[in-house]
């Protein structure tokens, strides 16, 4: 390169250098700002999670409880009112409203697989021969229904069109109004919503008890159990069979666990997981009763107990209420899933009844029904005689002319 050309190049490059020097270069974002930007970009957002291949043999409340426990083990806690379960005769699925990061949602399938391998998830939650299907719900979800149909399940309506789904809010969970959360729980059966649910640091439910309060004495329709130690895992299932069967064969009643025989409220340690297990246990036992016991025949609630002592596990009173059986056209006697029959007496349970005792019970019930029918026939007979007398009094007078 010649000296002249080199000087020209120097003269041309200097103005650029001066101009860049005069204007300050834009500052690069600092590490703190990048961190804030990434946090803002990865902020939790609301998503609708589709859960397929659920076991249709369980009822909707039990599926909701088991699914909530499963999501907790996957480090994705969800309130029960944010779980919408759709159950068909041979298929079931759920739509869950979650507020998580995108990366958490993307890692959900492999975390589910890891939990299944470590036996942290109840296998019975999935349909027989199937595995749980977790994915983000987008659009009408028709392709997921086709996957279930291809996998052997019976076809059903499209969940996006045939079932009216709730309009999930698009903003995050902390900004949701409390009225919406209460409304989503009020529209469901009473067995689904727990009295111990907490929304905005307030107990949702009209019932709460104070430790040491006096509830009264046991009656024919009220039974108290202290429930200490390993009661929930050992004795609770036997008491469910005995007392529910006895209440069904009488005028109904309530079993309260966490109350002493004297009527003082103590409460039992009952976590959300224990609550779910209790619901599953009661549901599985009552499904084996004969005649069939429908969900509207009983109510299982968990009443929070307010205590002055600080405990990590909340105290609750388990209340299993059997409603007064509807009048039947003929006497009906319930038996447990083990074929045993119990009756409620004043302050005690009679049973299991022998064959002769059951026959005597049926004979007495039929005598009562026969007496009612005889009384009804007597009333109808009297009404018939009165109507005949009225017809004779108001009837036309006939005259007969005799010619001699």
Swiss-Prot record:
Domain of life: Eukaryota
GO molecular function, one term: ATP binding
Residues reported to bind ATP: 258-265
Keywords associated with the record: ATP-binding, Coiled coil, Nucleotide-binding
Start and end residues of each stretch annotated as Disordered: 1-31, 139-170
Coiled-coil segments on the chain, per record: 365-395
Low complexity bias locations: 152-165
Comp. bias regions, Polar residues: 7-16
InterPro entries, sorted: Schlafen (IPR029684), Schlafen_AlbA_2_dom (IPR007421), Schlafen_AlbA_2_dom_sf (IPR038461)
Family membership noted in the UniProt record: Belongs to the Schlafen family. Subgroup I subfamily.
Protein name: Schlafen-like protein 1
